[in-house]
């Protein structure tokens, strides 16, 4: 469920192909996201999942899986 919501957001916000987004997808290397893209994406994720993502935490996210695990942990 978390992964699907993240994929939908990335497809809509960043005009990405959902097939290109997996747990192992790297934000910078595979998708070419810059820091502004990442910040905008995380702000939307905070709204959708009602979680808080600090700047330090954001910088530690390298893959989609990192985000999924963080959100799942903070939803519990």
UniProtKB/Swiss-Prot annotation:
It comes from the Bacteria. The keyword Repeat does not apply. Pathway: Lipid metabolism; fatty acid biosynthesis. Residues 1-75 form the Carrier domain. One of its GO terms (biological process) is lipid A biosynthetic process. Pfam families: PP-binding. It is found in: Cytoplasm. The gene is acpP. InterPro entries: ACP (IPR003231), ACP-like_sf (IPR036736), PP-bd_ACP (IPR009081). GO terms for molecular function: acyl binding; acyl carrier activity. This is Acyl carrier protein. 4'-phosphopantetheine is transferred from CoA to a specific serine of apo-ACP by AcpS. This modification is essential for activity because fatty acids are bound in thioester linkage to the sulfhydryl of the prosthetic group. The modification O-(pantetheine 4'-phosphoryl)serine is found at residue 35. PANTHER family: ACYL CARRIER PROTEIN, CARRIER DOMAIN-CONTAINING PROTEIN. The keyword Lipid biosynthesis applies. GO terms for cellular component: cytosol; membrane. The lineage of its organism: Bacteria, Bacillati, Mycoplasmatota, Mollicutes, Acholeplasmatales. Belongs to the acyl carrier protein (ACP) family. Carrier of the growing fatty acid chain in fatty acid biosynthesis. Keywords: Cytoplasm, Fatty acid biosynthesis, Fatty acid metabolism, Lipid biosynthesis, Lipid metabolism, Phosphopantetheine, Phosphoprotein.
């Amino acid at each position: 469920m978390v992964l699907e919501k993240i994929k939908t957001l990335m497809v809509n916000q960043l005009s990405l192909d959902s097939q290109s987004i997996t747990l192992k997808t790297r934000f910078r290397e595979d998708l070419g996201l810059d820091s502004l893209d990442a910040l905008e994406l995380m702000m939307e994720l905070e709204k959708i999942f009602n979680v808080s993502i600090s700047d330090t935490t954001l910088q530690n996210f390298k893959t989609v899986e990192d985000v999924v695990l963080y959100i799942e942990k903070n939803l519990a």
